[in-house]
Amino acid sequence: MATTRKPRGGAGGATQPALDFDAPGEIVCGVDEAGRGPLAGPVVAAAVVLDPARPIVGLDDSKALSAKKRERLFDEIVAHALAYSVASASVEEIDSLNILHATMLAMKRAVEGLSVLPTLAKIDGNRCPMLAIRSEAIVGGDALVPSISAASILAKVTRDRTLVELHQQFPMYGFDAHAGYGTPQHLAALREHGPCEHHRRSFAPVREAFDLIR
């Protein structure tokens, strides 16, 4: 899973619009993830370089927004950002690396997928992935830094859409309702049907469900 946007520019290699500078010459991207806690599906990360000439009203932590507003802002970010990239780490990578390292991998892939090379990555949380550029971890950054808010929205909407698609293949789990989180409905379905290939075997409730069917 990877989606990127190229920078805008006129014919003949016209210069790009002014970038999101923290300091002269600084190009900042915001980075966030969605899906660390669920029992199923990939962890998704996004990186966004916003265009200060085209501000987006209403950016916030994706968890504080309604699904309808997230979808609207998703379209605005895709249309107005100077660059964005969405990447993921698979269930297999989550199980082999652990969820923390898989999350860092997804973030690294998202930053490396940007078509504009940033000089600074602002990461939501208290850890940064290993990057070739400087990075800064900001706890609660998805509610404080607009570019991180934008990344939060892209990651959340992309992951939710992925789980809706998985629901079409495995309707018995109700992925469209809980996006893979360990709700009572999901746990009951795990006990009744056992896990599917998209469940994270390294997570305790899934391991326990596997043990029940052995």
UniProtKB/Swiss-Prot annotation:
Enzyme category, top tier: hydrolase
In the record, biological process GO terms are: DNA replication, removal of RNA primer; mismatch repair
Q: What is its EC number?
A: 3.1.26.4
Q: Which residues bind a divalent metal cation?
A: D32, E33, D124
RNase H type-2 domain location, by residue? 26-214
Q: Which SUPFAM superfamilies match?
A: Ribonuclease H-like
User: What cofactor does this protein call for?
Assistant: Mn(2+); Mg(2+)
Q: Which InterPro entries match?
A: RNase_HII, RNase_HII/HIII, RNase_HII/HIII_dom, RNaseH-like_sf, RNaseH_sf
Q: How is the cofactor bound?
A: Manganese or magnesium. Binds 1 divalent metal ion per monomer in the absence of substrate. May bind a second metal ion after substrate binding.
Alphabetically sorted, this entry's keywords are: Cytoplasm, Endonuclease, Hydrolase, Manganese, Metal-binding, Nuclease
Q: What CDD domains would the database entry show?
A: RNase_HII_bacteria_HII_like
The entry's localization annotation reads: Cytoplasm
What family is reported?
A: Belongs to the RNase HII family.
Protein name stated in the entry: Ribonuclease HII
